[in-house]
């Protein structure tokens, strides 16, 4: 018989109900940013146009599950239409990434003028509508040429090439970009794409027991190198901020046993501390060093000093919360994910409810717990919630009520965390529109706008969530008093596929 952690049950009840308290956009700090996001490969399309060369994501998606981002949402050609949707919504910031292989097709050296022009035009269009660009430099899409040449992130050479790429971006776009994320969810990228069963960029197997941690180490060094370059060369004039983002599940013990409590602390060390402890204190968590031994790379004294303090903010990617136990449990992540990483972690993950590839349970207290943990453990750094959203099957109705309920609950959690002292400065819904998704292709989607992927024109249609977010941002929706039935009725009369 399962014995639930009583404290966790109480927290679920108390914290979940607390989010129904009335709040509006005006309850957040004036400089808090509400936005939405996409990434280059998932949004742009135009994979073979205007000088772009293949990235490892092209290679992986073409050989993995048959669907790909060759056209995706065709954002490359439809960016003005999408910016207009953002402006109509009242979006304050738009998070997007720059395709390395579109801007610098060979990975280093020559800049592609058409790629450069596209991003300059996109940023100009955003600025002309009063929308703050938040630019991610790396969202999984390493130029395939660098993977073929030296193995990408498992080779120390990546640090120099990534820094040179970042230098081009800072120089060309930095006057109009004040928020930079170097690497998207570095944790899950390292353990998910360097696993035993799926190999990133070349679809072959490798030494996954070592490469996960080598890749993570090189990401930290590359981030620090780019960050230090920015601060030395550009920050005094451009006055921007630069950070790194991590994948942060909410983590809570499955039972009230001491073993599950300890397993949860180990999981937090591996999933949060792997990146955050070096960024804040200059070294890896003791739990990782004890467990991994020589498999965990070591920072030199100089590297430690470079990494420490290299993030002006921490980006958080959060979708749901899981239980953690010390006892063997069914594996809930996709079969392609690196199971050996979780074996190293010495903790088993259990879903809190009905979460799947097509739906996430809304567990807003889990996000609040993540923010409170980072506040207490890592000196309360500035935080941006860079991805938070709920997937649904792509052919679902436009009335995506579960997504609306999910988003408003998590926004309430962020507000609670801010009131408790968390220095959280922004919240970005994932995603603005339906995208190509890395694990499931076009089977499920996160978008607030529906995209008809069967239509060559990739027609966009607003979902209920777009209507709700618009109302929240322009101040016409009070979360506690909002009549969901009336919102659905108004919406159903104005939108169709």
Curated annotation (Swiss-Prot):
Top enzyme class: hydrolase
Amino acids binding a beta-D-glucoside: 42, 139, 184-185, 319, 387, 430, 446
Organism of derivation: Arabidopsis thaliana
Residues with glycosylation annotation: 65, 202, 354, 452, 474, 490
Family: Belongs to the glycosyl hydrolase 1 family.
Signal peptide: 1-22
Catalytic activity reported: Hydrolysis of terminal, non-reducing beta-D-glucosyl residues with release of beta-D-glucose
Protein name per its UniProtKB record: Beta-glucosidase 8
MF-aspect GO terms: beta-glucosidase activity
Active site: residue positions: 185 (proton donor), 387 (nucleophile)
Designated gene of the protein: BGLU8
């Amino acid at each position: 018989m399962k014995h639930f952690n009583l404290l966790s049950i109480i927290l679920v009840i108390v914290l979940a109900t607390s989010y129904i308290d009335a709040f509006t956009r005006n309850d957040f700090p004036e400089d808090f940013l509400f936005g939405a996001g996409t990434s280059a490969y998932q949004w742009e399309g135009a994979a073979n146009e205007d000088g772009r060369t293949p990235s490892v994501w092209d290679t992986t998606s073409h050989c993995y599950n048959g669907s790909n981002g060759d056209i995706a949402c065709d954002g490359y050609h439809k960016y003005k239409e999408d910016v207009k949707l953002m402006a109509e919504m009242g979006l304050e910031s738009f998070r997007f990434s720059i395709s390395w292989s579109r801007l610098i097709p060979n990975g280093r050296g020559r800049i592609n003028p058409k790629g450069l022009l596209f991003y300059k035009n996109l940023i100009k269009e955003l600025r002309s509508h009063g929308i703050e660009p938040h630019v991610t430099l790396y969202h999984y899409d390493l130029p395939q040429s660098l993977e073929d040449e030296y193995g990408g992130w498992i080779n120390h050479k990546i640090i120099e090439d990534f820094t040179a790429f970042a230098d081009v971006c800072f120089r060309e776009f930095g006057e109009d970009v004040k928020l930079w994320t170097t690497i998207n969810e570095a944790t899950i990228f390292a353990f998910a794409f360097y696993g035993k069963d799926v190999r990133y960029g070349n679809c072959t197997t490798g030494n996954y027991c070592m490469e996960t941690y080598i890749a993570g180490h090189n990401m930290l060094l590359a981030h620090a190198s780019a960050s230090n370059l920015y601060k030395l060369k550009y920050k005094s004039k451009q006055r921007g901020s630069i950070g790194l983002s991590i994948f942060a599940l909410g983590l809570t013990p499955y039972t009230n046993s001491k073993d599950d409590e300890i397993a949860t602390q180990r999981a937090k060390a591996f999933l949060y501390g792997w990146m955050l402890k070096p960024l804040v204190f200059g070294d890896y968590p003791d739990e990782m060093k004890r467990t991994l031994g020589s498999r965990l790379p070591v920072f030199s004294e100089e590297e430690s000093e470079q990494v420490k303090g290299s993030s002006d903010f921490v980006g958080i990617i959060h979708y749901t919360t899981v239980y953690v136990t010390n006892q063997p449990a069914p594996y809930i992540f996709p079969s392609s994910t690196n199971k050996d990483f979780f074996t190293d972690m010495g903790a088993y993950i259990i879903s809190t409810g009905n979460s799947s590839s097509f739906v996430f349970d809304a567990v807003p207290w889990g996000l609040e717990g993540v923010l409170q943990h980072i506040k207490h453990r890592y000196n309360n750094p500035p935080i941006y919630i860079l991805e938070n959203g709920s997937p649904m099957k792509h052919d679902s109705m436009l009335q995506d009520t579960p997504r609306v309920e999910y988003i408003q609950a998590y926004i309430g959690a962020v507000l609670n965390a801010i009131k408790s002292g968390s220095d959280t400065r922004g919240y970005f819904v994932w995603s603005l529109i339906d995208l190509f998704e890395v694990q499931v292709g076009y089977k499920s989607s996160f978008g607030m706008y529906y995209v008809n992927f069967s239509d060559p024109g990739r027609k966009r249609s607003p979902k209920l969530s777009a209507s709700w977010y618009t109302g929240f941002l322009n101040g016409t929706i009070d979360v506690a008093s909002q009549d969901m039935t009336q919102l659905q009725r108004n919406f159903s009369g104005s939108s169709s596929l």
